[in-house]
Amino acid sequence: MNLEIGGAVDPATSARRLQDAVKQVAGRGWHVQTLTRLATIDTLKDQLMDLPVPLVVNHFGNARAELGVQQPGFAALLELVRAGKAYVKLSGAHHISSRAPDFPDAAPLAQALIRANPDRVLWGTNWPHPDSSGRRSVQEVSPFVEVDDGRLFNELPRWAPDAALRRKILVDNPARLYGFG
């Protein structure tokens, strides 16, 4: 769920929408997956810590790669991950970095999230890579962004050098979250 539809950021609205989503999925064995910014994560941290369902945060929490691990709000995301209260997807590097094609400035963020709790990190492609760079009318079709998923996948060993760690990120953690196996 997008906690910031149209780029509007209102903590009260985000909190209410989150609670509505939780009510819908509670008791079904489902999780809530969010697209949000670090500022919203920071503001709602206490509420997120108390969710009765698993939380998945997309796109590195929408951190800005060029600002690194000390940017405002990143500590709140690390705290949620460290406490086992959120999974974070290492997905959509092209959303958080402008340094294509390898997005090297995303590496410190990925490494910090993995160090915080390797059992709460997932990897994803964000395929088919929708373009969310601006508002469009409901009649306009968003073009897809060209992203080399294979090349991004090849960054994972730099983010997680240990094969057992990569297995957690790619196999064990998704299996636990989605109930595979």
Map each language-model feature to its residues.
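Short, catalytically relevant binding-site loops at active-site mouths
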Residues: 38-41, 61-65, 94-96, 176
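Distinct, well-ordered alpha-helical segments
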Residues: 10-15, 38-53, 66-79, 100-111
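Active-site gating/metal-coordination segments in enzymes
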Residues: 1-39, 46-49, 82, 87-95, ...
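The start of beta-strands in P-loop NTPase/AAA+ ATPase cores
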Residues: 53-54, 121
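H/E-rich (His + Asp/Glu) clusters that bind or coordinate divalent metals
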Residues: 70-181
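Short, basic, helix/turn surface patches
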Residues: 59-68, 117
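Short hydrophobic/aromatic-enriched beta-strand-loop microsegments
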Residues: 1, 54-60
